[in-house]
Amino acid sequence: VDYIIIASLLAVLSWSFVDAVSKLYINRFGKELSSMILLAIGIIPMLLLATAYPYLGNILFLLFIGLVGGLVLFLGYILVYKSVPSGGVSNSYILLEVQPIILILFGIFVLGEHIGMEKAASIILIFIGISLILLSKKFKLDKRLVPALIGNVMWAVYWAIIILAFLYYKNFVLPLLFVRVFGAFFAYLYYKAKPPKNYYKINLSKLEISIIAILILAGLFDGFGNILFAFVSFSNKVVFGSAILSLDPIIIWLIGLIAYHEKITVRQKFGFLVATTGYLLFTLL
C-alpha cells in the first residue's frame, strides 16, 4: 500500500502544479492553444515509458479506445479551461472533487471495491460542499462554473473508460498513450477550426518565453500525473487513489486565494470547508 500512497501523492503534486499555473498560460494563449500544447507535451513521458513495455497487439482496440477516450479527455480540458479566466482558479478547480467521487462510485459499483458507511457519509459531505460552491449569492447556479463542472465530469468519464481499457488490455501504458495522442489531435483540430485571424501570434519576449516554459513544464507534469494515477488504477486501488486525489482541489483552492487574490463568497468558503471535511473524514476513517 505504501507505493500506492506515494504514487497517488506524487500524482496530486504533479496535477496541483499544472492547475496552479494554468491561469497564467490560459490568459496568455487562450484555452484552445493551451489545451493543444499541454496535451501534446504530455505525450512525451508516456512515449518514453511505452518503450519499456511490449506491444500486446490488438491495434483496433487501441485505436477505438484512443478515439473515444481522447475525445472525452479533450472536451474536459476545453470546458475546464473555459471557466478558469472568469470563474477563477479556486472555484474552477475545487470542482475537481467531482472526479474522485465519480471514480469512487465507479470503483465500488463497477470494479467491486468496498468502502464502509463512514466513507459513504464523507462522500455526501463532499457533494454538499461542491453544491454550495456552485451556487451564487442568490442561490442560483453560477453559470461561469458550469463548463468546469461538466469538464470535470468528462475527466471522470475519461478515467472510467481508460481504467476498463487497462483491465481488458492487461496493460496501462499503451491505452494511456493512444488516448493522449488522440486527445492532442482533437485539440489541434479544434484550434485549427478557428478563423486564422484569431490565431494567437507568439511574441518571443522574456515574459512570453517564461510562460511558454511554464506551459511545457505543465504538460510534462500532467503526463507524469496521468501515468502515476493510471498505475494506481491498474493496481486495483481506484477508490483508495481517488480519495487521495481529492487533496488536489483543496491545494489549488488555497493557491487561488493566496497567489491570485481571488474573491469568493461566504457560502463558497463554507462549501470549501464542508468539502474539505468530507475529504479528511474519507482519508482518516
Locate predicted features:
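Hydrophobic transmembrane alpha-helices of multi-pass small-molecule transport proteins
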Residues: 41-46, 105-108, 118-135, 267-284
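MFS transmembrane alpha-helix packing/gate-lining sites
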Residues: 14, 72, 99, 154, ...
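Small-residue-rich packing faces within the transmembrane alpha-helices of Major Facilitator Superfamily
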Residues: 16, 40-44, 101, 127, ...
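Juxtamembrane helix-start motifs in multi-pass secondary transporters
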Residues: 31-35, 92, 175-176, 241
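Membrane-interface interhelical linkers
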Residues: 1-71, 77-87, 136-149, 168, ...
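C-terminal transmembrane-helix exit sites in multi-pass transporters
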Residues: 80, 101-121, 137, 250-270
